[in-house]
Amino acid sequence: MKEQHNALQLMMLGLQHMLAMYAGAILVPLIVGAAIGLNAGQLTYLIAIDLFMCGAATLLQLWRNRYFGIGLPVVLGCTFTAVGPMISIGSTYGVPAIYGAIIAAGLIVVLAAGFFGKLVRFFPPVVTGSVVMIIGISLIPTAMNNLAGGEGSKEFGSLDNVLLGFGVTAFILLLFYFFKGFIRSIAILLGLIAGTAAAYFMGKVDFSEVLEASWLHVPSLFYFGPPTFELPAVVTMLLVAIVSLVESTGVYFALADITNRRLSEKDLEKGYRAEGLAILLGGLFNAFPYTAFSQNVGIVQLSKMKSVNVIAITGIILVAIGLVPKAAALTTVIPTPVLGGAMIVMFGMVISYGIKMLSSVDLDSQGNLLIIASSVSLGLGATTVPALFSSLSGAASVLAGSGIVIGSLTAIALHAFFQTKQPNSADIKT
C-alpha cells in the first residue's frame, strides 16, 4: 500500500472515490429529513453534517494507532439500515431520541469492540468470499434503478436514460481495454465526467442548486437539541450498529485480501472501535450511524491503487464539501443514470472479487459448496424480496431486513455446523 503518486493524481483518485459514494451518502439524509418533517434549513444542515462526518469517519478509520483505526483503504458513509429505524424512532419519541439512541449505540460499540474483534475466527475464506459476493449482488438492483433514472423519476426507464447509463458503462470498459496505467485507474471518474458532459447536451444537467447553495456551513453540537434516551430506541439502534459491523466486516476482509494483509483480532477490534467512534460522533453532531461503503472496494480493485493516502484525500474532500455547501451542490449535478452506469462496473467488481476470494476454498468439498449456495441464495432472496419478512417487527425486523446479514449469518452458522459434525467436510485450503 505504498504506491507513489503526485498531488494531482492523488486528488483525482480521491475525487473518484468520493463521487462513487456521494449518491448513497446524500440519499439517506434526504429520505430521513423528509420523513421526519425537517424544514429546508434543517435539511441543508443534515446533508452538510453527514458529508462532513463521512469524511471524519473515514479519516478515523485510516488513522491506524494503538486504540482504533484498521488502516485499510476504506471509505465510511451513513448506513441505509438506519433509515427505517430513525424514521420510526423520530415519529414515536421525537428527533432528540434518534440521536440519544445513536450516541448510546456508538458508545456500546466502542466499549464492546474487543468482544466483536474475537469474531474473526468465524470468517474463514468460504465465509468472507460468500459475504463479499452477497454484498456485490445486493447492490446490483440499486445500480439498475439508478441507470433507469432513479426510483420515482418521471422518466424512469426512458430510452434516453438507458442509453446514457449503458453508454457510461461502455465508455468505462473501453478505457480499460485501450488504456493502461493512470488513465485506467481513473476510468470511473472519467466515465462520470464524460457521462455528465453528454447529459448536459441532452438537457439533463441542472446547475440551479449550485447557484442557490451557501458558501459556508459550520457543524453544530446537538443541532436538534439535547438528546433523550429511550430504551426501545437504544436497543433498535444498537441492532442497526451490529448490522453495520457485519456489513463492514465483509468489506474489511475484501480490502485486506486486495492489499495482501492478514487481519488479526486486534485489527478488527480497532476497526470496530473506529466505527463506534464514528457512530458516537454522528450522534453528537446529529448526523447518522456509519459503516464501510462496499462500492469503494470495486474502485480499489479496478484502479489497483491501494494506498491509504488516496482515501485520506477522499476523507479530506468530504470534510471540505461538508463545510462548503456550494461545493457539495456541484457534485449533485451528475445525473442518476450516469451514476447507475458507473455502478454496474463497480458493483460487478465487488461480485467478481468475492468469486476470487472463493478460489482459495476447496470447492471439491460438499460442505463448502452448500455454504456458498445457501448463504448467497438466502442473501439474494432477502434482498430481492424485501416483503419476505414483512410480518416481523422490532429487533427481528432490523436483522432480517438486510440480505447481507441473512447471508452472513447463514454462512457462519453452516461453516460452524459442518466443522462440528464433520471436521473434514468444510476444510479450506490455506
Curated annotation (Swiss-Prot):
Subcellular location: Cell membrane
Record GO terms (molecular function): xanthine transmembrane transporter activity
Keyword flag Amino-acid biosynthesis: no
Transmembrane segments: 18-38, 43-63, 67-87, 97-117, 122-142, 163-183, 185-205, 209-229, 233-253, 274-294, 310-330, 333-353, 369-389, 398-418
InterPro entries reported for this sequence: NCS2, UacT-like, Xan_ur_permease
Bilayer topology annotation: Multi-pass membrane protein
Keywords, sorted A to Z: Cell membrane, Membrane, Transmembrane, Transmembrane helix, Transport
GO cellular component term of the entry, any: plasma membrane
Single Gene Ontology BP annotation: xanthine transport
Induction: Expression is very low in excess nitrogen (glutamate plus ammonia) and is induced by TnrA during limiting-nitrogen conditions (glutamate). Expression is further induced when allantoin or uric acid are added during limiting-nitrogen conditions.
Record family assignment: Belongs to the nucleobase:cation symporter-2 (NCS2) (TC 2.A.40) family.
Function: Uptake of uric acid.
NCBIfam families: ncs2, NCS2_1, pbuX
Protein name in UniProt: Uric acid permease PucK
